[in-house]
């Protein structure tokens, strides 16, 4: 999924067309209402080329889209991305805050999916004060989002994320009405992350969040890929078990397990 952010990292027509989907990032639960900063010492020539920026200079991502000031503005962007990407699914991601008000606003744009990011998710680069004190916990956010979409008869897929780590978390989210679950930190941990929380320093000792050549050499991508595959496949099998013991196997298989199988090869 191509994440479309305010400063338009790596936005080209080709990238939009070759993505599986495009997600307009309005907010993130660990730092709602805040932008982002990639320090210049992490902007290597390789990163600069990918992001269309100058090597060695800080890259600042604004906290909001300057061209989105109304429902119509957001709808225009969704329509534009749908056209440029030749029909790729377009989603909108929000931090779990004013959920009902936010859903009312963004549903006007008629996205294909909405991602609600609840408190409990993580990034090693968020201020602790904000990360630990803002946004609505994921499960409560899911309940409110599902309720709103159902009450307003909105045919928009609901993706939930934020602190969901293991199969029982995924099964609970599906049972509560999520159409899909997005995972981030859990995937990084499966690959190699040991949560040293040095992501913003460029000194990750296991080589996951760094551009240092020596540190990067410690990350064995073939092993990490295998571990991630094992994590996804094990989660899939455990979701099947939850589906069987709750008598929902048929609906879960058609809705979740078949697509999941496609992204978790053996």
Per-range role (PLM):
Residues 65-216:
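Glycine-rich phosphate/ribose-binding loops and adjacent secondary-structure elements
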Residues 58-65, 129, 219-226:
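Short coil/turn segments at secondary-structure junctions
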Residues 7, 29, 52, 79, ...:
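Generic secondary-structure signature for well-ordered alpha-helical cores
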Residues 30-34, 152, 205-240:
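Extended, intrinsically disordered, low-complexity segments
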Residues 1-80, 84-107:
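Active-site-facing alpha/beta catalytic cores
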Residues 192, 219-259, 263-266:
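C-terminal extensions of enzymes
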Residues 61, 65, 169, 237-243:
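Amphipathic, soluble alpha/beta structural segments
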């Amino acid at each position: 999924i191509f994440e479309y952010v305010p400063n338009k990292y790596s936005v080209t027509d080709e990238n939009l067309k070759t993505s599986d989907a495009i997600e307009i990032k309005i907010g993130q639960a660990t730092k709602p209402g805040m932008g982002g900063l990639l320090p210049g010492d992490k902007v290597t020539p390789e990163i600069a080329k990918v992001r269309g920026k100058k090597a060695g200079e800080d890259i600042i991502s604004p906290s909001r889209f300057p061209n989105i000031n109304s429902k119509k503005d957001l709808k225009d962007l969704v329509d534009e991305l749908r056209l440029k990407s030749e029909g790729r699914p377009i989603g909108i991601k929000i931090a779990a805050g004013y959920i009902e008000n936010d859903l009312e606003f963004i549903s006007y744009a008629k996205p294909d999916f909405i991602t609600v990011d609840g408190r409990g998710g993580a990034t090693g680069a968020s201020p602790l004060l904000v990360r630990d004190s803002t946004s609505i916990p994921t499960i409560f956010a899911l309940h409110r989002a599902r309720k709103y979409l159902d009450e307003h008869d909105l045919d928009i897929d609901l993706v939930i994320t934020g602190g969901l780590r293991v199969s029982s978390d995924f099964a609970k989210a599906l049972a509560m009405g999520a159409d899909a679950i997005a995972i981030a930190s859990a995937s990084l941990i499966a690959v190699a992350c040991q949560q040293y929380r040095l992501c913003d320093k460029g000194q990750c000792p296991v080589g996951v969040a760094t551009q240092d050549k020596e540190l990067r050499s410690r990350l064995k991508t073939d092993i990490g890929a295998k571990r991630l595959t094992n994590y996804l496949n094990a989660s899939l099998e455990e979701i099947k078990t939850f589906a069987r013991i709750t008598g929902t196997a048929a609906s879960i298989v058609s809705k979740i397990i078949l697509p999941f199988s496609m992204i978790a090869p053996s």
